[in-house]
Amino acid sequence: MIQSGVGMTSARTRERLVLRLAEKGISNVRVLDRFRAIPRHIFIEEALSSRAYEDKALPIGAGQTISQPLIVASKVQELLKDKTLDFKYKKILEIGSGCGFQSAILSGIAEHVYGVERIYSLVKKSSNLIRK
């Protein structure tokens, strides 16, 4: 499916981010597993890939940013609060889907994720990435 990469884009680097999220209070296994599964570096410019797994918002073009991982994880954890491990939402609508990273994270907890984005260049980029 999606390549693991090497160095700063490897599965081991993603695991370090997951451990930092857990240290900051993200305890839902499904949320942490989504961060293990989705390579954040493919959603940002290659020049910034060495910073992809920092817990920071990063520019994605058109004056927009990819959200800080802790913010994304906190929102998804809240969505799953009091839900069983096998629970899936039927539909989730994400307004301002940007590069598609959060939509990819959400795809593990919903049957269908619909993203709305007003900036065409981001729509085009995220559509291509989500198909992978």
Which residues make up each language-model segment?
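Short, surface-exposed glycine/acidic/tryptophan-bearing loops
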Residues: 47-60
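Conserved nucleotide-cofactor-binding alpha/beta core module
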Residues: 79-132
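N-terminal auxiliary segments of SAM/dcSAM-dependent transferases
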Residues: 1-47
